[in-house]
Swiss-Prot record:
HAMAP family assigned: Sirtuin_ClassIII (MF_01121)
Keyword terms: Cytoplasm, DNA damage, DNA repair, Metal-binding, NAD, Transferase, Zinc
Catalytic activity: N(6)-succinyl-L-lysyl-[protein] + NAD(+) + H2O = 2''-O-succinyl-ADP-D-ribose + nicotinamide + L-lysyl-[protein]; N(6)-acetyl-L-lysyl-[protein] + NAD(+) + H2O = 2''-O-acetyl-ADP-D-ribose + nicotinamide + L-lysyl-[protein]
Disruption phenotype: Not essential for growth in the absence of DNA damage. Increased sensitivity to ionizing radiation in log, stationary and late stationary phase. Decreased efficiency of NHEJ on blunt, 5' overhang and 3' overhanging DSB, fidelity the same as for wild-type NHEJ.
Binding site residues for Zn(2+): 112, 115, 138, 140
Binding site for substrate: 53, 56
Organism whose genome encodes this protein: Mycolicibacterium smegmatis (strain ATCC 700084 / mc(2)155) (Mycobacterium smegmatis)
UniProt keyword DNA-binding present: no
GO biological process, one term: cellular response to ionizing radiation
Entry cofactors: Zn(2+)
UniProt enzyme class: transferase
Name of this protein: NAD-dependent protein deacylase Sir2
Lineage summary: Bacteria, Bacillati, Actinomycetota, Actinomycetes, Mycobacteriales
């Protein structure tokens, strides 16, 4: 059986990864997300944007995968599992998942903004957050940026195509910790439902997907996932 997991910020929040909606450290609590997550913001103030993402890189590196990440990884022992994530952390990989597609890029990969070359150098140390820091410079003289998707940028083709295939070939799709409002990612469970596939939503809050999902559970990821596969036949029978 192939299980495709669509994961969002909620699964990593349980590990202590803050989202844009959380109160962050005092330095960044009032920052406009567009100011630090757009090409416009990068072009206006690359030093500020680089400082914010470098701090998040180190902050994410300090947190550990939680029970939900470990459960999804353990499913690979007896299932074909694909993980499509909107998260830019590496918690799925550190938990042991091997087929992970990052729709919004990764904060653990960096590239030149000018020539696109991958950055293999050392990152500057950052023991505490600062407002600005100079980005590294590529040999072509371009600035090094995080390999994440900013507002207005397209999703990476390879990750998107693999994600579409992962959903179209799945026997069941599990949507975990995502608000289901950010497109085109939010269209993936809709496509699965249109194809007649069971879609299980796991989210402590209702989302736009809740009414149409085959099963919608008001539970956190770490509460629901460890027993979800055992409960699956009963849940699907109840929804039929």
């Amino acid at each position: 059986m192939q299980v495709t997991v669509l994961s969002g910020a909620g699964i990593s929040a349980e590990s202590g990864v803050p989202t844009f909606r959380d109160a962050e450290t005092g330095l960044w609590a009032q920052v406009d997300p567009y100011e630090i997550s757009s090409t416009d913001g990068w072009q206006r103030n690359p030093e500020k944007v680089w400082a914010w993402y470098l701090w998040r890189h180190y902050m994410m590196a300090r947190v550990a995968p939680n029970e939900a990440h470990r459960t999804v990884a353990a499913w690979e022992d007896h299932l074909d599992v694909r993980v499509v994530t909107q998260n830019i952390d590496d918690l799925h990989e550190r938990a042991g998942s091997t087929n992970v597609y990052h729709l919004h890029g990764s904060l653990f990969e960096f590239r030149c903004d000018a020539c696109g070359s991958a950055f293999e150098g050392n990152l500057p140390e950052m023991p505490e957050p600062v407002e600005t820091i100079d980005p590294p410079v590529c040999p072509c003289s371009g600035l090094i940026r995080p390999s994440v998707v900013w507002f207005g940028e397209p999703l990476p083709d390879a990750a998107w195509n693999r994600s579409v295939l992962a959903v179209s070939s799945a026997d069941v799709v599990i949507v975990v910790g995502t608000s289901s409002i950010v497109y085109p990612a939010a269209g993936l469970p809709e496509a699965a439902l249109a194809a007649g596939k069971p879609v299980i939503e796991v989210n402590p809050e209702r989302t736009p997907l809740s009414d149409s999902a085959t099963v919608s559970l008001r539970e956190t990821a770490s509460e629901a996932l460890p027993t979800l596969l055992q409960r699956l036949p009963e849940l699907l029978n109840r929804s039929a």
